[in-house]
A protein has these predicted regions:
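Short, basic/aromatic beta-hairpin or loop at an interaction surface
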Residues: 90-98, 141-155, 196
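A structural signal for small-residue-enriched, beta-sheet-centric alpha/beta enzyme cores
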Residues: 154-155, 171-173
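Electropositive, beta-rich accessory/interaction domains or terminal extensions
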Residues: 1-119, 123-135, 177-196
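Short, acidic/hydrophobic/Gly-rich beta-strand patch recurrent on exposed beta strands
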Residues: 137-139
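A generic structural motif
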Residues: 101, 157-160
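Loop/turn positions that initiate beta-strands
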Residues: 114, 164, 168-171
Length: 197
């Protein structure tokens, strides 16, 4: 049995994001919240998405991300001199890459499409890896960030809500295996060619 912990729940509101000379609406930078958060079929109460053609919906209701990956992304920014912090040993804050759930105990190679995360009061089902867009480049501060996400596999994964309820930061969950035919890492691999350009 695989178990993990929900360390942070992160919510965001749609706001302007500068992408080059353009200003686009985005909710990518999310903030950790304290207290129970209601989980509905379309996601977490109080969380927003700007472009519903590519974000949100039943199969992308919640975005989960291994908390340890934030250190990798901070290092990418430091390497390119776009660090948020002067200290190179600090990691980016939870929610920075747009994740709703900051998790420990799972990585993309150990999570499969169809697996279920059983929390005390709700059940979430793994649906697909995150494939980043240009807004991710803007938030990270360098033009190859989306490519680096796909190449590194440090992408996180989307979840559908199978049983509505509530989530609480700090609670544990159990990973219940599905058919185990394709891991998140395997599902992301075919997208690497697209992001080589």
């Amino acid at each position: 049995m695989t178990t993990g912990q929900l360390v942070h729940i992160n919510l965001g509101k749609v706001r302007p994001l500068r992408v080059g000379e353009r200003k686009l609406m985005s909710a990518i930078g999310k903030t950790p919240v304290i207290g129970p958060v209601a989980v509905g079929l379309l996601g977490l109460a109080g969380d927003e998405q700007a472009d519903l053609s590519v974000h949100g919906g039943l199969d992308k209701a919640v975005y989960a991300f291994p908390l340890a990956h934030l250190a990798f992304w901070q290092q990418q920014r430091v390497t390119r001199s776009v660090s948020l912090f002067e200290e190179t040993d600090e990691t980016l804050p939870p929610g920075f890459v747009g994740e709703n759930l900051s998790l420990t105990g799972l990585t993309e190679d150990a999570v499969y499409i169809g697996d279920r995360l059983h929390f005390a009061d709700c059940v979430l089902r793994v649906t697909q890896p995150r494939e980043p867009c240009g807004k991710f480049n803007a938030v990270m501060g360098y033009a190859q960030a989306a490519r680096d996400m796909v190449q590194s596999g440090c992408c996180g994964f989307y979840l559908a809500v199978e049983r509505v309820g509530t989530l609480q930061s700090g609670e544990t969950f159990e990973l219940v295996p599905g058919a185990r035919q394709m891991s998140i890492a395997q599902a992301l691999a075919p997208k690497r060619h697209k992001h080589m350009r």
